[in-house]
Amino acid sequence: MNLRIKKWLEKLDQFEKILVHMPSIMYCGKLIGINGLVLEVSGLKLPIGTICIVEKNNSILDSDMIEAEVIGFRRNLLLLLLLSNVSDLTADSKVTPKILNGSYYNINKLPVCDKLLGRIVDGLGKPLDNFSKIDSKYNVSLTNVSINPLHREPVTHVLDTGIRSINGLLTIGRGQKIGLFASSGLGKSVLLGMMTRYTQADIVILSLIGERGREVKEFIDSVLTETVLSRSIVISAPSESSVLMQTRGAIYAMRIAEYFRDKNFHVLLIMDSLTRYAMAHREISLSIGELPVSKGYPPSVFSKLFSLIERAGNGKINSGSITAFFTVLTEEEERYDPISESARSILDGHIILSREYAESGHYPAINIENSISRVMPNIVDSSHYSFACHFKKIVSLYQRNRDLINVGAYISGTDPDLDMAITLIPKLNKFLQQGMLEKSNFLDSKKSLYSLFN
């Protein structure tokens, strides 16, 4: 009997905690349909971005409540998208707006503050590291006022990435937006780990969007030492999370980066991957009825993509910067990929990884011929740029004639430039390769480049 009373009292305590936070008037709708990922709800009128609670089995217990976001409306129906993957919903389930501090809880406001440093959170700012939740008083809007392009600080300072081939041949500027293009299995995660450890930045923000959940912990354990983690923030929305969580995770990471940029910090933002972000938006757009126009992608996906990328970069004059590395997944047999082409057109440069290099044990597997940094001519001296171009020419010349050389069809002395390329290529390949735990700062990389030709 005592055990039964104890259980009843525990239930009453749960109900009491819920009732304390309930407003005097509750607006309520009901679930009348599910179309793909989208829930159709009648009886409510709420702004886009509002979080609603869908009650399973008409229960008010936390365990039976599911959160969903208002993403649009159709005539008198609200369109909601679930924040988690749930399959046991029933018709006529009760739907109510979530209340926080006396007002509707809007997903477009999440915690952004210094307390996030050293933390690992999901796409909604909820802790994944078993530490305390960030107080809602730090919530700010995820949207931000765009900076007048005439007021932005130009990219004029070199960013030391600690990677010899990038420092020497694809020099990155502080505030630059770079794409890392690669298919699976080419050492992309290893290269990102090296950038995270060695890049000279005040704050590091890692946005892991739509990737394998197993890799999230492995990446954090192998890359984020205590020193690096203390100045880092990790936002994780793995592939098993909802598409809404994945899109929010990317936007949330960018908003945090903007916050620190506005405080005059130099921020390194690594987003892995931009392709998963676009795919998540595609699922949402198709679910609410948008028509696909390019390889299954609706037009709104590209506007979202450009909007996200353009938020990175330098801030106003004499303020901080966001140097962003966006990974883009490519299909080697696909001649045209709309996401890759769109990203390439708007980014300030691209680093392409080569399967041929990776399979031969050449790491990092950067294809120097096809990679480019568009700001490099503006931030390095003329001799450095000249040596980098000369390096690329020699590699390109050797690659074009490699088959002739390998089969013995080329006769030495026929082409002096090719003779020089054959002599230098072992040194050039050694310059391009670098161990995972090896760091090469900008000055050392520059000296190594010069020494190849002197």
Swiss-Prot record:
InterPro entries from the UniProt entry: AAA+_ATPase, ATPase_a/bsu_AS, ATPase_alpha/beta_chains, ATPase_F1/V1/A1_a/bsu_nucl-bd, ATPase_T3SS_FliI/YscN, P-loop_NTPase, T3SS_ATPase_C
Entry GO CC: cytoplasm; type III protein secretion system complex
Residue ranges of the TM segments: none
Keyword Ion transport: yes
Top-level class of the enzyme under EC nomenclature: translocase
A single GO BP: bacterial-type flagellum organization
GO molecular-function term, one example from the UniProt record: ATP hydrolysis activity
Reaction equations catalysed: ATP + H2O + 4 H(+)(in) = ADP + phosphate + 5 H(+)(out)
Binding, ATP: 182-189
EC code: 7.1.2.2
Record's keyword terms, sorted: ATP synthesis, ATP-binding, Bacterial flagellum biogenesis, Bacterial flagellum protein export, Cytoplasm, Hydrogen ion transport, Ion transport, Nucleotide-binding, Protein transport, Translocase, Transport
Pfam families (UniProt xref): ATP-synt_ab, T3SS_ATPase_C
SUPFAM superfamilies associated with the record: P-loop containing nucleoside triphosphate hydrolases (SSF52540)
Subcellular location as annotated: Cytoplasm
Protein name: Flagellum-specific ATP synthase
Organism: Buchnera aphidicola subsp. Baizongia pistaciae (strain Bp)
Taxonomic lineage of the native organism: Bacteria, Pseudomonadati, Pseudomonadota, Gammaproteobacteria, Enterobacterales
Gene it is expressed from: fliI
